[in-house]
């Protein structure tokens, strides 16, 4: 699909959000004076994606406005107004083909790559939730993100309908050959939500998660197997939040190197985080 005005068939969830009263808001994009084309703004220091062959990264047009999915880096932030969507869309298909679960910790965003993992902070009360982008929207002005009902509940914005939030990119999920999210990357629940607020590790250097185990012996076995893998080494981190023993490869010289490795397919669903 060429980068021009293109109409992409979106889900009933996304299109339905056009008529949802809670989905009015500010986008991260500014329009050209004489064109209905929206490009990334400086809120996220993003750039147009080169992944044009990936269906969820193709430009698409809604109500005469063209949106270009973008590439962002771990640690980038943006502030804006969040809304939420729920009962009217529960059980319908999202833009990436999943079945929408209003109770899962997911979100709709106009241009972030599918399966981007975001930490969302309600600036009114400092409550936080971690969500995974699995849908497109909201497609009206003055909204930065549409949260699921479950995510909105976590940061206490159900009653208000909207709230000022800060979004931070904390990682990137991936899918296996069946286009299913690989649950070992983040602590996902049975219905695709991120369980236990998706606790991951943050810091300065980048590493790649290759497994997560309830049983410490499982983590130790994998860590020993890949103690030295190519130029990388393994390490285990145990979360005090969910009790999972996560196995990481370390030694990446840059975020780009870590992301290239995660995308190489060496480990199904490899997931980039900051050490």
Swiss-Prot record:
GO terms for biological process: cell wall organization; peptidoglycan metabolic process. It is a lipid-anchor. Belongs to the RlpA family. Coiled coil: none annotated. A lipid is attached at residue 23 (N-palmitoyl cysteine). HAMAP family: RlpA. The keyword Cell membrane applies. The gene is rlpA. It comes from the Bacteria. This is Endolytic peptidoglycan transglycosylase RlpA. Its EC number is 4.2.2.-.
